[in-house]
Amino acid sequence: MGGRVQDNVPVPTITSNEILVKVKAVALNPTDFKHLDVISPPGSTIGCDYAGVVDKVGDAAGATWKVGDRVAGAVHGGLFPDKGAFAEYLKVESDLAWKVPDNVSDTDAATYGVSAVTAMLNVNVRHGLPFIDGKAAAPRNETIFIYAGSTSAGLYHIQLAKAAGCTVVTTASPHSFDLVKKYGADAVYNYRSPTVVEEIVKDYPDMSKAVDCFSEGKSTTVCAEVIKKKGGKVITLLPNGKSKFPNVTYDLVMAYTALGHPFQWLPPIGPKFEVQPADREGLVRFYSALPQSLHIVKPIPTIEEKAGFDGILEGLDKLRGGKVSGGKLVVRFGEK
């Protein structure tokens, strides 16, 4: 829907503080097909999560990068003609990417894009918990609630919250209980249970921080009810209503605000998003520490599609149809 593969797109031209990346693998997100189908202006390149090798280095980026370095990160796919990840080449600001160690595959590296960046913004910037710095923080007397912990975003939220020293409470389907515990959850509850709020509040009555990694239907209300005794903030990944409780606020967060530019969806009538300097600073800090912190923030499970653009299109169709579970879809470019 809404897009096509083009083979006559020029290689992006970089500025002095950018690097040119030859893409080796990408990861797929629901935001990709939403941009393709509805949001993106004509001529923009879709795709956010990438891994690859540095092909060219801007004059001001030479102290950090050299040609041939392995690199990964996230870009604002679906807004620009030369920055989307679903391309053979993309350009990115040199401090908004991370160096991939030799023991991490391209497909695993590609998963540290939108899902991981969103988790960093929510856990470290908005909720103010300690950033990763190569070692786990000392335990703190604080518990955080993460709704939908088995999602790609949820698994990164769990890991970053644990790395910050928190006790992590989450929800999932029973078949995913072991998965979320493997990634660090201290307690997990069946989100389908009609008494899930009562069960959580009984065991953890004093939470004030929540993140809704589903953000549809009743999920945000569940988060609010879990923290309403003490009051606090629920962070959502999509707009999902307004809080019914005066001591609970909702905060919509999107990974794109970490990329340092204002943007608007469906102009002139769509919502505008202003520059958030603290978000960009957070991403620089996160990606700088990530290569030394991969024993703490581990890659999430992946499902590999066929290589190349056909694999991307088929994967987006699966996401569009709600046919993906158990891992993040990834696609390789070129040889395995």
Predicted regions and their residues:
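Terminal helix/beta-alpha structural elements that buttress the NAD(P)+-binding lobe
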Residues: M1-T15, K22-V57, G62-K336
